[in-house]
From Swiss-Prot:
Protein name (Swiss-Prot/TrEMBL): Large ribosomal subunit protein eL8
Keywords assigned by UniProt, alphabetized: Cytoplasm, Ribonucleoprotein, Ribosomal protein, RNA-binding, rRNA-binding, tRNA processing
Subcellular localization: Cytoplasm
Subunit description: Part of the 50S ribosomal subunit. Probably part of the RNase P complex.
Main location as per UniProt: cytoplasm
Originating species: Natronomonas pharaonis (strain ATCC 35678 / DSM 2160 / CIP 103997 / JCM 8858 / NBRC 14720 / NCIMB 2260 / Gabara)
Length: 120
């Protein structure tokens, strides 16, 4: 487990979160990549943040859980960058992503946020 991963996410919750990212990508708005995700979190625009567990060097995403907690934005760890990239509609992996407007995934995002809060 990476240094920045501070709780384990069950596989079913990870799958639900990635599905919500796909729906938000199609019906709402998502930010892809560490820089865009960081900006969305710092501005308080993010509804749910995704961080890959396989990022190297770890310093690339190490700050995200801390600033998300500071801004009271839920975040979830996902196994690989490829999982996030695929769900966000990219042909390549992405170390991080954020749902800015959940669109039709609004209910799912709220459920995921509650479950993540219980895990932390």
């Amino acid at each position: 487990m990476s240094v920045y991963v501070d709780f384990d996410v069950p596989a079913d919750l990870e799958d639900d979160a990635l599905e919500a990212l796909e729906v938000a990508r199609d019906t709402g708005s998502v930010k892809k990549g560490t820089n865009e995700t960081t900006k969305a979190v710092e501005r308080g625009n993010a509804e749910l943040v995704f961080v890959a567990e396989d990022v190297s060097p770890e310093e690339v995403v190490m700050h995200l859980p801390e600033i998300a907690t500071e801004k009271e934005i839920p975040y979830v760890f996902v196994g690989t960058q490829d999982d996030i990239g695929h769900a966000a509609g990219l042909q390549v992996g992405s170390a991080a992503a954020a749902i800015v407007d959940a669109g039709e995934a609004n209910g799912e995002v709220e459920d995921i946020a509650e479950k993540v809060e219980e895990l932390q």
